[in-house]
Amino acid sequence: MSRLGIMVLTLLLLVYMATSHQDAGEKQATQRDAINFRWKRSLTRRTATEECEESCEEEEKTCCGEXDGEPVCARFCLG
């Protein structure tokens, strides 16, 4: 094989390695973002649940969730 052929193959190999490394970085970043989103969402839910429980506790009722951002309090929760 000539020098030119070897240089072309080497260049193609380097380009392939560089692009596959970039793709792996994008995939890793996407997975990290998904994990962070789930973590933030669970913190928000926990805070909302605690607020609902505190609000209903004042009325001596049970927190059944939220509707339109407001806590739903009742003696017994159905469903």
UniProtKB/Swiss-Prot annotation:
Main location per the UniProt record: secreted
Annotated S-S bridges: 52-64, 56-73, 63-77
GO CC terms: extracellular region
Localization annotation: Secreted
Keywords of the record: Amidation, Cleavage on pair of basic residues, Disulfide bond, Knottin, Neurotoxin, Secreted, Signal, Toxin
Signal peptide: 1-20
Gene Ontology molecular function: ion channel inhibitor activity; toxin activity
Disulfide bond as UniProt keyword: yes
Propeptide: 21-44
Residues with Leucine amide modification: 78
Expression by tissue: Expressed by the venom duct.
Matching InterPro entries: Conotoxin
Family: Belongs to the conotoxin O3 superfamily.
Record comment regarding domains: The presence of a 'disulfide through disulfide knot' structurally defines this protein as a knottin.
The name this protein goes by in its record: Conotoxin ArMSGL-0124
Organism: Conus arenatus (Sand-dusted cone)
